[in-house]
Design a protein with these regions (language model features):
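Glycine-rich/acidic phosphate-handling loop/turn and adjacent ATP-lid/helix
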Residues: 79-108
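Flexible, glycine-/charge-rich segments associated with ATP-binding catalytic modules
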Residues: 1-15, 116-142
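Bergerat-fold GHKL ATPase/HATPase_c domain
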Residues: 1-43, 47
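Short, highly conserved beta-strand within the GHKL-type HATPase_c fold
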Residues: 73, 79-84, 132-134
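A conserved short beta-strand within the histidine kinase catalytic ATPase domain
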Residues: 66-74
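Glycine-rich phosphate-binding loop
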Residues: 104-119
Length: 142
């Protein structure tokens, strides 16, 4: 249910590396509807969204899985910008409270830590056989 003055954009994206470009393009179009969203808030939410989508592409499905589905819902109000990412992949076995940045020599494992650090709230849950990631960035004033 939308709040008064809330802008919402929902779209489907392939669960494939090229979905990152699609998501970034849709975010750019979404930002164009309200130029009062600060550059910092745009960057924070976009970084978190891209990192979570990359993790979905890499980890949520077995290599030969068919029927992959990713839904992205973007919303903004005067107080916040938010993304909800939903996929039908394997459950994520993750404790968000334990996420930390890996050692500097690590070659992977930074994406989720970057997402958690970038936004004000990251929530993961599994609802009706789907993974759901909710990313919230409270808006700041430039």
């Amino acid at each position: 249910m939308s709040e008064p003055g809330e802008r919402v954009d929902t779209f489907e994206a392939p669960v494939a590396p090229e979905s990152l470009d699609l998501v970034q393009d849709r975010l750019a179009a979404f930002w164009a509807h309200d130029e009062t969203v600060s550059a910092a808030d745009r960057m924070r939410l976009e970084m978190a969204v891209v990192e979570i989508v990359a993790n979905i592409v890499e980890h949520a499905f077995t290599v030969d899985a068919g029927g992959r589905a990713l839904t992205v819902a973007l919303s903004m109000t005067h107080e916040r910008v938010e993304a909800v990412l939903s996929d039908n992949g394997l459950p994520a076995e993750i404790d968000l409270g334990a996420v930390t940045m890996p050692d500097e020599d690590a070659t992977s494992g930074r994406g989720l830590a970057l997402a958690v650090a970038a936004v004000d709230e990251v929530v993961y849950d599994r609802v009706e056989g789907r993974n759901r990631w909710r990313l919230v960035c409270r808006r700041t004033v430039d």
